[in-house]
Amino acid sequence: KGITVFDLLNIATGKKLNKKEACTILSKVGLCALEYVDREINDSLSGGELKRIEIATVIARNPKMAIFDEPEAGIDLWSFQNLTEVFKDLEMESQGITLVISHQERILQIADQIVLLEQGKLKKVGSKKEMLKLILQEPRCCQRKELEHE
């Protein structure tokens, strides 16, 4: 038998959870059915389910700061919508900071602040409203530069 979602949550927290505690953590990412607790981490889980389980392992630790690097990668649009709801809920109940790194414009809907980087350097920081206004007024400030082929 392989590693289960329950095993993974116990490893993530560093303590022995009971199944009710594990289910409570999973419910925070939209996996509230008790069936997920005993599921094996294998091909039977969708990409969206795996992403939410991955996020649940972070939430389970109750961090002061959580960093998610391109959490939307490899998931479909429906799973993406669920993922944005998870981040909105996480923001409302968390006392810490959640940093989401993404190249996808659609992730902007969950942002409080937006940081623009260019070639690894800080270009601009501002509120979502301020930065979206900048992007709309000066779209070239945020365009991806295509590599020139010789």
Feature roles, as predicted:
Residues 19-36, 40:
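Conserved ABC ATPase "signature" region
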Residues 109-116:
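Conserved catalytic segment of ABC-fold P-loop ATPases
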Residues 2-18:
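Q-loop/switch helix immediately C-terminal to the Walker
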Residues 54-55:
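Hydrophobic anchor residue at the start of the ABC signature
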Residues 70-71:
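Walker B catalytic motif
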Residues 86-100, 108:
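Conserved catalytic loops of ABC-family nucleotide-binding domains
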